[in-house]
Amino acid sequence: MCPPRGLLLVTILVLLSHLDHLTWARSLPTASPSPGIFQCLNHSQNLLRAVSNTLQKARQTLDYIPCTSEEIDHEDITKDKTSTVEACLPLELTMNESCLASREISLITNGSCLASGKASFMTVLCLSSIYEDLKMYQMEFKAMNAKLLMDPKRQIFLDQNMLTAIDELLQALNFNSVTVPQKSSLEEPDFYKTKIKLCILLHAFRIRAVTIDRMMSYLNSS
């Protein structure tokens, strides 16, 4: 029987706060690191820097709206759609793989992250979930940027470096997946709400970028 999702997430967070880098690296069921993993680590580091810079710029530019982590309502757009936290569990918590494979996902990849071709199922599942996260955020950011570009004030729009960093890591992972197109809104955009949404999305994405970077670091050092 799978443990309750809430209890599992709490357990993961407690473990993350106590496990050091090497412990996690030894626990993760992976093959020996390949040059592809090192390349993906570089991409994940670039992504983390890019989203951090974009968030900092947004907080400075949008100083008249709530844009700090204490002020915003935190939202995870991947909730109930992907399972990255569970899929990237360390070995000691991976007691039942069926608990982590509750969704149908494509595990076919030509990406350089798995260039060795001998990665474990759990590693592939983890990287596939990361790929799906990135695709969702990419779609959200592109839709949001299109709205921001319509703002007569032209106050802020997304840094191309961040969008490029997302695309580069997606290409390195290169999983086959079905992208569900977003429906275009016929409503007149509310630019104030869009900017608040931007702050919320950037905070959430930075947290996910930290998780992705740590995951790639563990894979590279294991």
From Swiss-Prot:
Keyword terms of this UniProt record: Cytokine, Disulfide bond, Glycoprotein, Growth factor, Secreted, Signal
Recorded superkingdom: Eukaryota
Positions annotated as glycosylated: N42, N96, N110
GO biological process, alphabetically ordered: immune response; interleukin-12-mediated signaling pathway
Keyword Secreted: yes
Subcellular location(s) of the protein: Secreted
Molecular function terms, GO-annotated: cytokine activity; growth factor activity; interleukin-12 receptor binding
Signal sequence region: 1-25
SS bond list: C40-C113, C67-C199, C88-C126
One Gene Ontology cellular component: interleukin-12 complex
Family the entry assigns: Belongs to the IL-6 superfamily.
Job of this protein: Heterodimerizes with IL12B to form the IL-12 cytokine or with EBI3/IL27B to form the IL-35 cytokine. IL-12 is primarily produced by professional antigen-presenting cells (APCs) such as B-cells and dendritic cells (DCs) as well as macrophages and granulocytes and regulates T-cell and natural killer-cell responses, induces the production of interferon-gamma (IFN-gamma), favors the differentiation of T-helper 1 (Th1) cells and is an important link between innate resistance and adaptive immunity.
Assembly with partners or alone: Heterodimer with IL12B; disulfide-linked. This heterodimer is known as interleukin IL-12. Heterodimer with EBI3/IL27B; not disulfide-linked. This heterodimer is known as interleukin IL-35. Interacts with NBR1; this interaction promotes IL-12 secretion.
Protein name, entry field: Interleukin-12 subunit alpha
